Amino acid sequence: GSITVESVLNVNASGVIGGNSAKKGVSVSGIDGKASSATAKAESVNIAYVNNGVLEAARGKASISANTSSKTDAQALAPNFSLSLAEMNIVNVYTDSNDSVEAYVTGASRVSALKVDILANGTAEVTATGAVPGVTVSLVNGNAVIVTATAAKGTNGKVTKAYVGRDSEVYANGVTENENTVHSLKVSAESNLTITAKVPETKSIGALKLGVFLVKTIAGKTDTWAAILGKAESTNDIFVLATDKITETSNVELFSAGLVAGGASRAENTVESQNSSVQIGDGAVLKAWGNIQAQAVTKTNAQTQIQDAAYGGGTNCSVESKNNITRKTSLVIGNNVNITSVIGNIELLAEEDKTSHIESIATGSSGSVYAGGGPKAEINYNSTVTATVGNGGNIDARYGTLDIKAIANTDLYADAYRKAAAAAGSNKSEANINSNVTVVTNISKNGAKTRILGEVTTIGAYIENQVILAKAKSYTASAGSKTEAYATSNVNNNVSTGVDNAW
């Protein structure tokens, strides 16, 4: 039969607070600077492992898997009565989520079965929602709406790991009969993180005198890692896969408010450190009769969108839409490895997903007289993709193809637009993109010679797809106004391939 070592964890956290018109039935009457405030946090650790053990399933499969699914939700519904206060936050929403998921075989362990899976999967959804008051609010100073959704801000961030330890051995020895019964060896770590911060549509609220809207998501550090550090053999295929996916959305759909003069409202996404890596450790042995694939992938989708009032902002008001993204994708093949595909292909890849897309949109419009300010759309993007092969090893696919590649894909779009239907002292839209991309493949740098053999061998570093578009447009209906639009793209690409000591 089959052997399963499985750990499943579902985590849910929520915080809701509402005004006297809220369906939740919570009445908020205290005016203490936090009229509507909601917080939700979640943190979890989930591990499935075999340590110094022997698992043998001669006629079945062996599966070691850890799966965590978490949802964190905070909602604040502003009170539906008149407020008059000098300094206060009408809505303050905060969420945070951190989880650690690991599946591994370590110590002097031996796992043998027709099919072997070592799988770690962590899925997290984080949502923060804040609604503005439904009646008149008079503010002299201070922010009106603050909505923050964060994840992976803990000490270690969001961790997802699947690996075979240095002294462990794993064997998949099944015979594939058809496409539905493929007996392979798979080590896979997959992380999915979705973060959303939003202010729902606030059309026709009336003469609100709000300060600013600050709506933002923050992904701290994700660490997704798959590795074989010991010995792995398969009569079919071997897969070592790490996939890290982040989706961020910050959205202010529409607000109709005569904003306090000088207010800068902002929708912002930040990915502080996204990491996906695959490692074949020093001295590791991988042998497959079929294909061997070691692949690290990052996927990043981030959208910020903000639109100011159809009825106009105050003097020198502005709206900003901003994305700050840092991602790293890496493949590390250690020293003195022995990787052999008897009759198949070997694919060693560090790759950014082609469907990744980052977008900042800021829209300003007004039917009233105002002066100064304008929309700004900005993207700050830093990406590193590396594939590194160490010294003194042997990589052999003599009857198939051998690929060692680092591949980057970039799709950035910033759009700022303002339409002024009446006289404006100035009307300026700005769109800025700053992009830094580094793609590097290195083979046997500064050390003993590595043997590389394939019927067809490709070693390279590539930017396969790069779309960078910054667009700014300003329109003023009346004469006598200063109308400006600025769009800039600063792009720095560094692509290199080095084969120092290989044959």
Range-by-range predicted roles:
Residues G1-W503:
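Low-complexity, glycine- and small/polar-enriched segments
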